A protein has these predicted regions:
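Gram-negative bacterial Sec-dependent N-terminal signal peptides
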Residues: 1-19
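N-terminal leader/targeting pre-sequences
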Residues: 15-172
């Protein structure tokens, strides 16, 4: 009986220690709509913040802006009279309405994630950590976005870090 109690306690402890995780399918997006799947991003709760581990293929090599957007849609949307790829996702997640694009480690909006690195084969597999996001509940139902260009986490010389057009999107 004592062994059963110890085993039961161990199982409960392991279950309690298991952190939440979410797998997001990411698709190429254009002004015409949602395209082919480029892979997935696994999001794990860790004691250091949310960890985003991409398993994406078919991207342009280099650094790409990576953000959580405010709305849970990857459909095209209109902005200033133009149809925008994944425009229905809205802007970067900014629940406190800071209006500041200061990067994943500063006091700007929490939708800023560290940039995603894509190797010369077009694969993104390196995880990034978002220390200001601590729970999947903060981003559930929002859009995860990969931009065409890099991100300097500032509004100069180009707005929103200079990441440019939206290239890939998935709903968390």
């Amino acid at each position: 009986m004592k062994m059963k109690a110890v085993a039961l306690f161990a199982l409960i402890a392991c279950g309690a220690a298991h952190a939440a995780s979410e797998q997001v399918t990411v698709h190429q997006v254009t002004a015409e709509g949602i395209g082919k799947s480029l892979g997935t991003v696994k999001i794990d709760e860790t004691k250091y913040g949310l960890q985003f581990t991409p398993d994406l293929k078919g991207l342009t090599p280099g650094i790409h802006g990576f953000h959580v957007h405010a709305k849970g849609s990857c459909e095209p949307g209109e902005s200033e009279g133009k149809v925008v790829a994944a425009g229905a996702a809205g802007g970067h997640l900014d629940p406190a309405n800071t209006g500041k694009h200061l990067g994943p480690y500063a006091e700007g909006h929490p939708g800023d994630l560290p940039a995603v690195y894509v190797d010369d084969q077009g694969n993104a597999t390196y995880p990034v950590l978002a220390p200001r996001l601590t729970s999947l509940s903060e981003i559930k139902g929002k859009a995860l976005m990969v931009h065409v260009g890099g991100d300097n986490h500032a509004d100069h010389p180009k707005p929103l870090g200079g990441g440019g057009a939206r290239y890939a999107c998935g709903v968390i």
